[in-house]
Swiss-Prot record:
Protein species of origin: Geotalea daltonii (strain DSM 22248 / JCM 15807 / FRC-32) (Geobacter daltonii)
Gene Ontology cellular component annotations, sorted alphabetically: cytosolic large ribosomal subunit
Name this protein carries in UniProt: Large ribosomal subunit protein bL25
Gene3D superfamilies linked: Ribosomal protein L25, beta domain, Ribosomal Protein L25, Chain P
MF terms in GO: 5S rRNA binding; structural constituent of ribosome
Role summary: This is one of the proteins that binds to the 5S RNA in the ribosome where it forms part of the central protuberance.
A Gene Ontology biological process term: translation
Family of this protein: Belongs to the bacterial ribosomal protein bL25 family. CTC subfamily.
HAMAP family (alphabetical): Ribosomal_bL25_CTC
Amino acid sequence: MDQRILNVELRSKTGKGISRQLRRSESIPGVVYGKGIESVSVSLKTKELSNAIAGEGGRNHILTLKGGGSLDGQMVIVADLLQDSLKGLPLHVDLHKINLADKIKVKVKVNLVGTAAGVKEGGLLDFAMHEIEIECLPSHIPEHLDVDVTSLTLGHSIHIGDLKELPGIKVLGDPKASIISVLGRAKEEAAPVAEA
């Protein structure tokens, strides 16, 4: 996972009024917290945040903070992002300070590879789990987890426990939880036509 720069400014005032003022000036409020530091209120440009988390990996990019006094040079990931439900614009962000030597838990997207054999037989793909929680060092966070579905037949599923192990990455969650299934019945062969 690549590292990106994010400019932040310390802010001493908090509350709805200040948050609205920030949003009008194309900035958003945020907070930085983590092991070894007290929570610090910050503001940052909306466009910079959007660019920093754009593309594969999204919120799991390691961000290096610039500005913000004692926060300068700290590495963070986006722990939570509150967005406007209609416009999709960021409203508030929680940034979690990380240490590259400590494992963290993050959710990564599931990327389906291939076409399931059961779909070719007329089945319907049920993609139940679009993200999977993993634990690893920040430098080992994958952009996504590939799940090969080519051999998935009708009435069968791929579960968390079926995923192959990746070096340095521990997949979390119930091993019996279904990630993807193929629903439906096999096509019935046409019944022979009786001669009159």
